[in-house]
């Protein structure tokens, strides 16, 4: 048995596509369908590759935890964020002193977005029962009492915006 991996596939026209291969050497069908959907809807090969690697991390996590992708709860995604932040390959390791996260907040946010979109695709195709997007997103009213008002504040002040509850705060660029 090997590792879960991304396999690059070269098509007849030299275009690159990607497949997620499980430990037994077989393609992971739901991910294959999703990556094909991304291709059919015109997403670039780089986007497909990035999504493939994000899904590889997620399936590695699922395998480590012994979970089935069809029965994921919000609690599992919260644990997945912690797993992504861990500087160790295993979630069974507890550090004695604080260490830097293995991935940046931006990378983790991208991965969570990929997973949310993947589950939205599965839900719309009736492959999973739970609408994960409904659980991940919440409405937030942005018309607070701050002094700063955006140019279109008067248009949007009573409309809620939708935010992902798992999104990490990213440090500002210097």
Where are these regions (language model features)?
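Basic/aromatic DNA-contact patch characteristic of tyrosine site-specific recombinases
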Residues: 1-43, 49-56
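Residue-level marker of intrinsically disordered, low-complexity segments enriched
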Residues: 2-8, 18-19, 70, 126, ...
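Intrinsically disordered, low-complexity regions
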Residues: 3, 26, 144-145, 173
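N-terminal core-binding DNA-recognition domain of tyrosine recombinases/integrases
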Residues: 31-46, 56-150
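Long, amphipathic, Lys/Arg-enriched alpha-helical "connector/arm" segment
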Residues: 95, 100, 147-174
